[in-house]
């Protein structure tokens, strides 16, 4: 179980690190090299994003990577094969991140069954609220996979309680309202929000949207269980190449 893995790792580390890649960006061979660099540098778990043409939760950096991957031929079946290879090769949990249109076109239950077949441990689908995702949640439960839902600073306490009840593995707490990759100021206001998140659930908390350096991660220690680095990883690849990935991850410790 994903939650059990996270709790075991947390006994060894003050905070875990989850990274994010867009499969097929800049191409599949390079994507696998990036995954390898991340794992060797000590990443604890990883989101594999299936590219989509209109990723509503993502800012310009990840949007651009989605569009480039699609232009390069990153289709769902190819992403499944990539994910299968990654999960077989590396001994960390991999999750899918994508949008409901991808599941709808593939078929929700076949999509979830495929996840189980290739050893993907859970999924983040930002545009699928639990009220509209009963078939998805049922399929995930049947396969013992983790549907991960999202809290934001604007989520009411009552809504947090409900979302947490429909979540397995961990809750993804976005550090601010908006899209990925923008500047986030990690302040006492965010600390108060994370305290609300902690009161809403006993599940581990992951925090993303704007996490980019050692200072951000230091701020999150004691407040969250997992720091999520997404857009900044793409910037590193674009500016420093694959060889910069491991150095960057080690700089976050």
Curated annotation (Swiss-Prot):
Q: Would the keyword Magnesium turn up in this protein's UniProt record?
A: no
State what protein this is by name.
Tryptophan synthase alpha chain
Origin organism is Desulforapulum autotrophicum (strain ATCC 43914 / DSM 3382 / VKM B-1955 / HRM2)
Instruction: Tell me a Gene Ontology molecular-function term this record carries.
Output: tryptophan synthase activity
Q: Name one GO cellular component term.
A: cytosol
Task: Please report any disulfide bonds recorded for this protein chain, giving both cysteine positions.
Answer: none
- Which domain of life does the UniProt lineage start with? Bacteria
| Reaction(s) this enzyme catalyzes, per UniProt | (1S,2R)-1-C-(indol-3-yl)glycerol 3-phosphate + L-serine = D-glyceraldehyde 3-phosphate + L-tryptophan + H2O
Q: What class of enzyme is it?
A: lyase
Note the subunit structure.
Tetramer of two alpha and two beta chains.
